[in-house]
Amino acid sequence: MDTYTFRSPYSKFVLATTVIIMVLMHGAFMACMGGMVRSDFGSGAFFTNLLIFAACVFVVLYAFCIQIRKVTLNDTTLIIHRQIGKVRIPLNTITKVETKDEIGLDLRLWGISFFFGHYGLFYNRTLGKYRAYVKNSDQMLVVHTSNRTHVFSCERRDELLTLLQQRMS
């Protein structure tokens, strides 16, 4: 049983935007903590700052935890490894595999872009609703199943595309 592994590194653009957003988030954390220290416990200002702080922490943790690390392909399954959890796609459910060139203009239904990559539920007219796990938009692959569409990025995308097409036939 052969297992192929394809890493999923950041593009330079996504890495730069992630660093910039983390610096801005750090500023938001510090401003909220300063606001909580300066306001009376239990006041509206205290709870507003606490809510903003909690929302910022949630966004950072959520974006970090769902980012793609690598993709593996074995004889029966394509697996998208995230920081926490895996997405398993049985090869016998795959109906079509193709490349994708652009994600920047797609509608985010419940997704994050440019912060650790592009993740979540997206929509465009060609694909409809799809789940995105993308760190590098130059290396995107689309996998269609009977009930869901996945878009992800990995190194050696064309090699993975060829392997998937061979196993589908």
Where are these regions (language model features)?
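N-terminal membrane-targeting/pre-transmembrane regions
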Residues: M1-A45, V142, S146-T149
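Non-transmembrane, membrane-adjacent beta-strand/coil modules in membrane-associated proteins
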Residues: D2-T5, H81-S146
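Short, surface-exposed linear segments at secondary-structure transitions and domain or protein termini
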Residues: V14, V97-I103, D158-R167
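Short amphipathic alpha-helical segments, especially helix-boundary/capping motifs
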Residues: G34-M36, L51-A55, I68-V71, F116-G117, ...
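Loop-to-helix transition at the N-terminal end of transmembrane alpha-helices
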Residues: F41-V59
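Conserved beta-hairpin
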Residues: V57-E98
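Terminal membrane-proximal soluble interaction domains of membrane-associated proteins
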Residues: S137-Q165
